[in-house]
Structures are given as C-alpha cells and as structure tokens.
Amino acid sequence: MNEPTALSELPPVTAWLSDMDGVLVKENRALPGANEFLAALRANNIPFLVLTNNSVFTNRDLSARLANSGLDIPEENIWTSANATAAFLQQQSPGSTAYVIGEAGLTTAIHAAGYVMTETDPEFVVLGEVRSYDFRALTQAIRFIEGGAKFIATNPDVSGPSDEGTLPACGAIAAMITAATGKQPYFVGKQNPVMIRAGLNKIGAHSERAAMVGDRMDTDVRAGVEAGLRTHLVLSGSTAREDVCNYPFRPFGIHEGIGDLIELVEAAH
C-alpha cells in the first residue's frame, strides 16, 4: 500500500473542521487539550468550524452548552446537521416547502433558509432528531412521502448516548418510515461529504488546505476522506487504534487526543 504523501510535500492547512463529542467534549466536560487547540486556531487566525450531527439544539444553545463545559465557541463557529440540511434544501429548491419533524435546531435552520413549514402538500419531508415521537406526525410524514414528497433526513445515526442510556436517533426513525413507504431518505449529515463541503463553503476554505478531526471512522473520517480533506482520528472518543484496520480507508494521522494537533496548527504559520 502506498504511504501518504510526505507532510513536507503538502500545502499548509489553513482551515480546520472538528467533530464535537469525543473530540472536544465528553459527557459535558472539555477534553484535555481542547481549549489549547482552539486557542492555537485563534492565535493564528485560522478559520474553523465545530461539527455535530445533533440537530436538536440551535447554534446558540450549543454555544451555551459548550461554554458550560469550559469551551468558548461562538455560534458562528458551529455547523450542525440541521444547518447543513437547511443549506442543502436552499441550494436544491430555494424558497420551497417542507413538512418538518424535529426540534428547535432543525426548525430554526429551515426557517432561516427561507422555507415555509407546512402540513399542506410539501415538496420535502425533513426528519431530524426529536425528544419524543409523535405517531400522528410520523403517519403524516409517511402519507406525504407516499404522495410524492422527497424524503430528507439530517443524519444516519441510529442511536445516541444519554445519561440514562442509549436513545434512538434519526437513522432509527428514518428506517421506520422507510419500512412503511419503501423510500430511502437522503441523509445530509456525516457520513455524507455534503456536510463537510457546505461547511468549507461557509468559512471560505478549500479542501486541499483543510483538515477534519474526528473520533469515528465511519462518519468523521469517511466524510473527510470523501470530501478531500486531510483527516485526523483522535482516540479520545469511540474508536480504538485496533479498529482502524477494519476500514478500507484510513486517516492521515492517528492521535491520542486533540492536544496532539496543536503542533500542526502552529506549524502552518
């Protein structure tokens, strides 16, 4: 197998995208090196985004939650699957209509994209994370899709963690709708590189000079690889070093935690 291109032959990284959970925070606590990594980005005037597939919270909510964890990340530096989904819809069919199942993070983003949320003949059915599942809403979504509405979902994650244990996530509910309609959704969030490319567009960055940091091979690293970024896997989240060989792609670098990347940030300037 060919070795990755030598670091000295690559252009410097001038923009960074980082996953949130398992990279910067874990169980509402900042991970070691997270503050120092963010400080290095700011000190070197490097544009960055913090990414999450969670579509429940608005960017303002997430910024406040991160502040409670000890991290200062303004809402304009946050890019959620809800933001990416709204940007995708705005690009595909500007000013159209959608039947939306989701929380404030998704509905706020859809409104900001100029969409009308409706229960009358929508062009799209858009599914995000929800805290409680409404049988009537799911039934309505199924009937709209059967009637020709296009099925969009924020992210393919089938489960997520909570203080009480595992919770069903967007992908699990999407599977139920698919079982009833025979229609597969188009997932916008990671592992789809669309979310990465839209984030790069937001900060005016190019893939060949950007890096993606994540703790999961199947979403973060895969999306980064497919979008053409240099990917860095950190072992502070859900992936162990021995898991990497189970995938047909590999990250540019593997690190114990986000603090190990500070040197790379500073070396670019």
What are these regions (language model features)?
Residues 1-46, 55-79, 86-269:
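Asp-based, Mg2+/Mn2+-dependent phosphohydrolase catalytic module
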